[in-house]
UniProtKB/Swiss-Prot annotation:
The keyword Chaperone does not apply. Zn(2+) 1 binds at C191, C193, C196, C201, C202. One of its GO terms (biological process) is circadian rhythm. Zn(2+) 3 binds at C196, C229, C235, C239. It is an enzyme of class 2 (transferase). This is Histone-lysine N-methyltransferase SUV39H2.
Length: 410
């Protein structure tokens, strides 16, 4: 259960001292509603099917074991098919059954004989696990959308295995500095332009070109920093030089990959080439701390460290525990996203924001990827990687499948 006031003070929680079933029983006994555990005014005194657990045939009548929403498993009951008005759940039950049978037959789908009177315990157990997984993923999806501060929606999908939400991941929208690191989030100066597209603006003050064209697409080469208008600028929110700060505009889906790469991210809408897609955020730590954590991550076979080496190599972004959708974006040696360094309110060149832009048109349903070796400088040479404190460790085999695959993530 979330601790009181946790939302206001940041992402933290404590373990629940009792089971979900016990909480539901207590709520019903005291006539209390609690949406987070499924107790609502609608089902406080009524019964609503949450999912179907099992199946049997008795005297030629079909029965399903029903889990009632907001009620503990001890109240599950067998109900005749004719009494069930939940076609979607019935279809889901059937799909899960066939998926399980396909898996045990190594991909060869089979149709169970009509004279089967009961389900095998292993099938029923799998169906219940899938139902509980869907509920957990839906709750996680709802939480992600409550925490995000951008326009694009976040969806979660797993049709591959029984993996549920990550147990130790907290969604954030901006950098989270580690103790001892200070982030300046207020610019010292801003422009007074009436039209930032044509007038000398923040990029010119920094000695670089305006990063975007009139279609909000990036026009500068990789390695060139982006300087957007900031909180001290006189221009409004429709300024053509305010793109990254508006956040992700596209609806994205965190999905389970089928080739052993864990979670991935795909777009649900078409993304034009050279468009801003998302920021890479996480905990900002020192490079020394990154080296220490990196040894631990290597043993687990994960890679979430991103060196902020635009001008120096003092800091690293660690998205292992704290991050946004970018935490789940997979590596590819032939990616469709490109890294750029961005400066908005914090102009400290040691601490650029990391933005990911599309390198080409990305169609709806296509997975988003970026090159884990690519930096905001545009450099992907092996020399720059070997000398990076966050990368100078055990090499991880790459599974991107690209024709140009280098064989390793780092």
């Amino acid at each position: 259960m979330a601790a009181v006031g946790a939302e206001a003070r940041g992402a933290w929680c404590v373990p629940c001292l009792v089971s979900l079933d016990t909480l539901q029983e207590l709520c019903r006994k005291e006539k209390l509603t609690c949406k987070s555990i499924g107790i609502t005014k609608r089902n406080l005194n009524n019964y609503e099917v949450e999912y179907l657990c099992d199946y049997k045939v008795v005297k030629d009548m079909e029965y399903y074991l029903v889990k009632w929403k907001g009620w503990p498993d001890s109240t599950n009951t067998w109900e005749p098919l004719q009494n069930l008005k939940c076609p979607l759940l019935l279809q889901q039950f059937s799909n899960d059954k066939h998926n399980y049978l396909s898996q045990v037959k190594k991909g060869k789908a089979i149709t169970p004989k009509n004279n089967n009177k009961t389900l095998k315990p292993a099938i029923a157990e799998y169906i219940v696990k899938k139902a509980k997984q869907r509920i957990a993923l839906q709750r996680w999806q709802d939480e992600l959308n409550r925490r995000k501060n951008h326009k694009g929606m976040i969806f979660v999908e797993n049709t591959v295995d029984l993996e549920g939400p990550p147990s130790d991941f907290y969604y954030i929208n901006e950098y989270k500095p580690a103790p001892g690191i200070s982030l300046v989030n207020e610019a010292t100066f801003g422009c007074s332009c009436t039209d930032c597209f044509f007038q000398k603006c923040c990029p010119a003050e920094a000695g670089v070109l305006l990063a975007y064209n009139k279609n909000q697409q990036i026009k500068i080469p990789p390695g060139t920093p982006i300087y957007e208008c900031n909180s001290r600028c006189q221009c409004g929110p429709d300024c053509p030089n305010r793109i990254v700060q508006k956040g992700t505009q596209y609806s994205l889906c965190i999905f389970r990959t089928s080739n052993g790469r864990g979670w991935g991210v795909k777009t649900l809408v078409k993304i034009k080439r050279m468009s801003f897609v998302m920021e890479y955020v996480g905990e900002v730590i020192t490079s020394e701390e990154a080296e220490r954590r990196g040894q631990f991550y290597d043993n687990k076979g994960i890679t979430y460290l991103f060196d902020l080496d635009y001008e120096s190599d003092e800091f690293t972004v660690d998205a292992a525990r704290y991050g946004n959708v970018s935490h789940f974006v997979n590596h590819s040696c032939d990616p469709n996203l490109q890294v750029f360094n961005v400066f908005i309110d914090n102009l400290d060149t040691r601490l650029p924001r990391i933005a990911l832009f599309s390198t080409r048109t990305i169609n709806a349903g296509e997975e988003l990827t970026f090159d884990y070796q690519m930096k905001g400088s545009g450099d992907i040479s092996s020399d720059s990687i070997d000398h990076s404190p966050a990368k100078k460790r055990v090499r991880t085999v790459c599974k991107c499948g690209a024709v140009t695959c280098r064989g390793y993530l780092n």
